[in-house]
Amino acid sequence: MSEKYVVTWDMLQIHARKLASRLMPSEQWKGIIAVSRGGLVPGALLARELGIRHVDTVCISSYDHDNQRELKVLKRAEGDGEGFIVIDDLVDTGGTAVAIREMYPKAHFVTIFAKPAGRPLVDDYVIDIPQDTWIEQPWDMGVVFVPPISGR
């Protein structure tokens, strides 16, 4: 990936609230299935905004920090997804999204970010990201002291 897109906590919350507003009325949803790990924080934000208490996970591994690798389902939520929102942080090449669609064909699949290759596989998203851009999520970064340029 040649470019990086850094997401702050504030940006993430703003984007999640925008997505939540599109998912109203909240009474239409039985619950949320968050794709672990990228969808965990966005899933918590959606659950808060929509007042949803039923939150489950589907645990899929497809990345090793910044390298995509073979897809592995570690745990899945039961059912076909009817009445559920499935949330992930982003859709990239579409590998995870295809697996989600197969597991939960009746779910409403949403992400915060979408890259061109995976965009057709989600029902809704908030931000377009170029395909060759790596997204640095706030939960993957730490806040550190940066000394002044002058050194004083």
Swiss-Prot record:
Q: Which stretches are annotated as coiled coil?
A: none
Q: Indicate which residues the UniProt annotation says bind Mg(2+).
A: 89
Q: What is its EC number?
A: 2.4.2.-, 2.4.2.22
Q: In which pathway does it act?
A: Purine metabolism; GMP biosynthesis via salvage pathway; GMP from guanine: step 1/1; Purine metabolism; XMP biosynthesis via salvage pathway; XMP from xanthine: step 1/1
| Keyword Glycosyltransferase found | yes
Q: Which cofactor does it need?
A: Mg(2+)
Pull one GO CC term from this UniProt entry: plasma membrane
Q: Which residues bind guanine?
A: 92, 135
Q: InterPro entries in the record, alphabetically?
A: PRibTrfase_dom, PRTase-like, Xanthine_Guanine_PRibTrfase
Membrane topology recorded in Swiss-Prot or TrEMBL: Peripheral membrane protein
UniProt: GMP binding residues:
69, 92-96, 134-135
List the GO biological process terms.
Answer: GMP salvage; IMP salvage; purine ribonucleoside salvage; XMP salvage
> Which protein, by its recorded name, is this?
Xanthine-guanine phosphoribosyltransferase
